[in-house]
Amino acid sequence: RDTDRSRGLGDVYKRQGHKTTHNILATKAFTVSMGTADTVAQCDYVGIVSGNKEPDKFAKAGFHAVKSEFVNAPLIAELPMTLECELLTYDKESCYMTGRIVNISADEAVIGDDGKIDVFKLRPITYDPIHHNYIALGEKAGNAFSDGKALK
């Protein structure tokens, strides 16, 4: 895996009582792995099944946890991109947490010719809360910090 050290921030919402929340609060670290179009069923499974009720949910999904070199939290070996974060804040009332991204790891298979993560190779998914679908991202819609100049 190629890695990129970063200083960004990540925000996450995790409900109390979840095994993940307990682990994050205990270790003061977490990872956010990017689901892909090829891993929709596995990612959905680990999202809907509680680790408190199914301790082997990673194995049932065909996932393997591996230790991060940068934070005290696991990476999912089968997912090609992961944000590795240190916990900065956790609000018990809202269950909202903020972390500092200390590293971004990516599988060589999703790295483009320019040495950066290629979204077209990654094929990340996002959740559509209106229709309850997963949407694969990857079509270029425009040029950032450029297309808007036409309106000046």
List each language-model region with its residue ranges.
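Single conserved hydrophobic/aromatic residue that forms the stacking wall/gate
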Residues: 2-13
